[in-house]
Amino acid sequence: MKIKNETSAGGIVFKKEKNKTLWLICQHSYHKGWVFPKGLIGDKKENEDMKEAALREVEEEGGVKAKIIDDKPVKVSYMYQWQGSPHGGKNGGKILVKKTVYYFLMEYLSGDPKNHDWEVSDAKFVLEDEVKKTLTYKADKEAFKKILKIFKSHFLQ
């Protein structure tokens, strides 16, 4: 089995609405899991840095513009098996993908989650409890737990 390493960046985006904090989650079109917006670094622009990729992915998959609140990302790693070639190619066979994702805490600026791209079938802002119940993958739940600590250090002093 082939092994492939992937590095992605994304955003865990919050929005203050009345006295509540809402968080952006997306349902992926392909695997139907609920996730935070993220994507490969440098797949659309050569020499793209982690922050640029994270902001771009939030806009593409989440339909919103956001700003990075904390320069230090949360890192999560996991492995998954891909049947065929990741991201389009024609080479078949199973591939083991070792994925590392860097998530930045971000604050919503503008836009509507309904304006997401084709990779996402749904995107919405929800309360913290719903995020915890809705996220599909352990790595995203772990990232959210870490981001909440960073969020609290910035906003609940």
Regions found by a protein language model. Give the residues of each.
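NUDIX/MutT-family hydrolases
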Residues: 102-107, 112-147
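Short aromatic/basic micro-patch
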Residues: 35, 98, 125
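Conserved Nudix-box catalytic region and its N-terminal flanking loop in Nudix hydrolases
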Residues: 20-65
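Conserved N-terminal beta-strand and adjoining loop/helix that marks the start
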Residues: 1-23, 42
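Short, charged/polar surface micro-motifs in flexible loops or helix N-caps
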Residues: 18-19, 30-33, 42, 74, ...
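Residue-level signal for short segments within beta-strands and strand-turn junctions
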Residues: 13-15, 27, 107-108
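Active-site segment of metal-dependent pyrophosphate-handling enzymes
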Residues: 63-112
